[in-house]
Amino acid sequence: MKATGIVVEYNPFHNGHQLHLNKARELTKADVVIAVMSGSFVQRGEPAILPKWERTKMALAAGVDMVVELPVSFATQHATIFAEESVRILDALHVDALFFGSEHGVSEDFLTAAKTVVEHEASFNQAIQLALIDKKTSYARAYTETFKQSFGTELLDVTKPNNILGFHYALAIQKQNPTISLQTMARIHAGYHDIEANHDQIASATAIRKLLLAGNLEEASRYLPASSIEILKNYDGPFLSWENYWALLKYRLIQAETDELEGIRNVSEGIQNRMQIAATKAQYFSDFIESMKTKRYSNARIQRTALQILLNARNIPSAPYIRILGMNKTGQKYLSHHKKNISLPIVTTVSKAAPGLLEEDLRATNIYTLVKGLENYQAGDFHIPPILKSQT
């Protein structure tokens, strides 16, 4: 069976995702499509708008054959780690191809850039460090500037969010397993960060979340496949944003000793001091973010750091594993065929996992489900089994 991997958040699953999924299967001639999906919290350091099990249902209903959770310690990191660990999981699952959407749309250019960086990695990394020192900027901006100086923007514009992720997928493949085929398609219409829905059928997940958070499911439905609409109508919990967790974060920042926060992942350069001061003054999370923004700290950096503090994520290495969230019969058949040759631990029953392996994800779920209306999902990692979809 030919397998194609995709890296997703489905926050929530919309028409653009359906197009991407269909093209992934068509263009790579895949027999099975495996999605590595963020769990309770997503890459920009935000809570997912829906629990991971509802988003897994959406993925399976739309045609994904297997959904695997990207551990929270990797899912909420910058593009390098996010991509490296996603590729590590897909490689362990023996995928033949990785398919992604990008603003650029030309697979060969991602591979060319990645190969060049791998060949000159030491000098490239040195240039990034110099940019960090000289310009007192964020790591993401330093990386982007170094890339632009090395390649210009004609080869690949890494200021675009999906281009930079795609580049890091290509980089990870070059380092881990160059036999994996990398293929992309150009994103159409809605940009990743567009906050307004302005097309008949395609809108960004950001714009759709804005509609859902405003209670406008009917308007959001224009941009969702029928299967997602049905799942949303049957969902009786709240739609979530950072504001749901602001009181928890504010308490954590106010009560903690400054040196206690130094061992938290992503906490460096005294950012915790600024956060603690900002937390005492901000009424809402949006106020907190605005008061924290500087040239050095992007929104994403602030949110990721805030999330690590909320989750009490210590700055220690995490081990990768394969946590199955859901499968259809094709996915089950594929897993059964390859199970003996998969190098990472496979988790289908959390209670049987090695001690400590899922500790951070279990804590993330427990914190995520503290919000009123999510009582049915509390301790869900233990009582909600992998979702098995029958194929008709």
UniProtKB/Swiss-Prot annotation:
Record's subcellular location: Cytoplasm
BP term (GO), one: tRNA modification
Catalytic activities: cytidine(34) in elongator tRNA(Met) + acetate + ATP = N(4)-acetylcytidine(34) in elongator tRNA(Met) + AMP + diphosphate
Cytoplasm listed as a keyword: yes
Gene Ontology, cellular component aspect: cytoplasm
Transmembrane regions listed in the UniProt entry: none
Gene3D superfamilies the UniProt entry points to: HUPs (3.40.50.620)
SUPFAM superfamilies: Nucleotidylyl transferase
Main location: cytoplasm
One Pfam match: HIGH_NTase1
Keyword terms, alphabetized: ATP-binding, Cytoplasm, Ligase, Nucleotide-binding, RNA-binding, tRNA processing, tRNA-binding
Disulfide bonds: none
EC assignment: 6.3.4.-
Enzyme class at the top of the EC tree: ligase
GO function term, MF aspect, one: tRNA binding
Keyword Transcription (UniProt): no
Family annotation (InterPro entries): Rossmann-like_a/b/a_fold, tRNA(Met)_cyd_acetate_ligase
Positions of ATP binding: 7-20, 101, 162, 187-188
HAMAP family: TmcAL (MF_01539)
Similarity field: Belongs to the TmcAL family.
Biological role: Catalyzes the formation of N(4)-acetylcytidine (ac(4)C) at the wobble position of elongator tRNA(Met), using acetate and ATP as substrates. First activates an acetate ion to form acetyladenylate (Ac-AMP) and then transfers the acetyl group to tRNA to form ac(4)C34.
Protein name per Swiss-Prot or TrEMBL: tRNA(Met) cytidine acetate ligase
Species: Listeria welshimeri serovar 6b (strain ATCC 35897 / DSM 20650 / CCUG 15529 / CIP 8149 / NCTC 11857 / SLCC 5334 / V8)
Gene (UniProt): tmcAL
